[in-house]
Amino acid sequence: MRIAHIAPPWISIPPRNYGGTEHVIATLVEEQIAQGHDVTLFAPEDAKTSATQIAFFPRSLFACDVPWQAHLKAYYHLHKSVDYLKEHVQDFDILHTHLSSAADMYLFPLTAALPLPQVTTLHGQFPFDRITTEWQGDADRYYMEWLSRIPLVAISEHARRFEQEKFPLNFIDVVYHGVDLKDFAPPSTAPEDFFLWVGRLTFEKGAHLAIEAARKAGVPLILAGILDQNIPDVQRYFQERIEPEIDGRQITYIGPVSPHERNDLLHRARGLLNPILWEEPFGMVMIEAMAAGCPVIAFRRGAAEEIIASGKVGFLVNNVAEMVESMQKIDTIDRTLVRRSIETHFSAQIMAENYTRVYKQAIRMKRNTKLFVPLAPARDQTSAGNLAEDRVLQ
């Protein structure tokens, strides 16, 4: 299949440290090439890819210190990519776009008129940095009109349900993210005596709760993550809730880490703490940890119930007290079983195969109708709490 991916222009592909969407795109593209597809990637020149690459910027925007608010820069990349596709539409079977920030919404009117079949993966929580109750007015209705014509892929059952309660989004399927298992060493039989927290240092990611749990459990905790210096609320959170707790002994902050460094930490850690305070659409760090054989203790929010079979490959908890209790039981988890759950359900191979299925569905839809219309989900809507449980038992 001849596949075109338009990536967001903000972060390099793959990312050097933080960048969940970009890491997923990089993994998917490489696996699709390995499976014999002809892949073209529209991304800045600093991408490292085996795909045919078409670039309109020499470097990703963040590498040039361009802030999120500079939407016109992103629009230029998206517009030029779509212009190229209009001129070479006969060279492609499917267009796959990736929605991860408000700037990416320029894609809606740009791609809706393309004769090329397409799908868009919603990587974040719509409408991103917009407040849902303020999603109104002529401009918003304009984008929503176009959005209703684009077939969307959700990254979890929870994300699909959560978004459709707010907006008439046109989800045609759910495809879970996957990881390249070659990037992860076999599970350790003797992990070191520390717990790990990885992510963006924002309130909703819950680093302060991981610290509280580690203090109460009396165990060492390593914090690894990126601190956005350009957002005052994030700076205040770090200065007031995180920095005073860092002592270099029990609580250590090591800053952002590369994917290789992160995977090594996950391989060595007793467990990953993930006390999220928002309805996270997926949670890449959980499957990255599990690919390394590292069990995850996560708050029962977002898609966590679809990933973690509690008591078998990790623990789902409701508060810090339950997290502390689970930390004391972490060594009862079989790290080999943790890894196996990723091999059988969250690998790059499975992700790419599932997208091939979705592409074929989108191509059929394009042939049969002028506008995309919502379809009933293909899979049985088993409750999310049973999804991870069923996978472990298979």
What residue spans do the PLM features occupy?
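Catalytic cores of nucleotide-sugar-dependent glycosyltransferases that transfer UDP/GDP/TDP-activated
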Residues: M1-Q394
